[in-house]
């Protein structure tokens, strides 16, 4: 299971280009024009974020995919951020790694582009509208995505403790960059 910070839709394109993986994503994406269809085709595990009782199905699907040897990417911040740090992790999906006895690989993504603020021009966060952001993004040249993979972590038996350990490593990698 890959666990990454999240700065917007570019993260999915970047991580998806490196290795085939399923993503855990918010359920409303399923109904977005074009993206919903691509998400479904790509095997996204849809999660109803505001309904804790609806977590059981996506959690079991994640466990099954991990047990079958699949890669699943989770963004436990639960939303995208501005890239200046890492938001607190929600611990629910760390239970999947524990039940599947699957190592967790911390991942940090950072963006840069010459002459522009990646926070303002590259990262898609907060209440930005998609189409204006995409149009501006297409005009930015030389965007660099730095992806840093941490060492696999054994899950142990406590999802909250696992979430804290992985959070610490992802936050450290975001701060310092490092080998990719």
Residue ranges and their predicted role:
Residues 6-8, 78-81, 111:
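Short glycine-rich anion-binding loops that position phosphate/pyrophosphate groups of nucleotides
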Residues 43-66, 71:
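A membrane-cytosol interface segment of integral membrane proteins
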Residues 1-52:
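Catalytic core of membrane glycerolipid acyltransferases/transacylases, capturing the structured
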Residues 1, 44, 71-75, 103, ...:
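Residue-level preference for the first positions of well-ordered beta-strands
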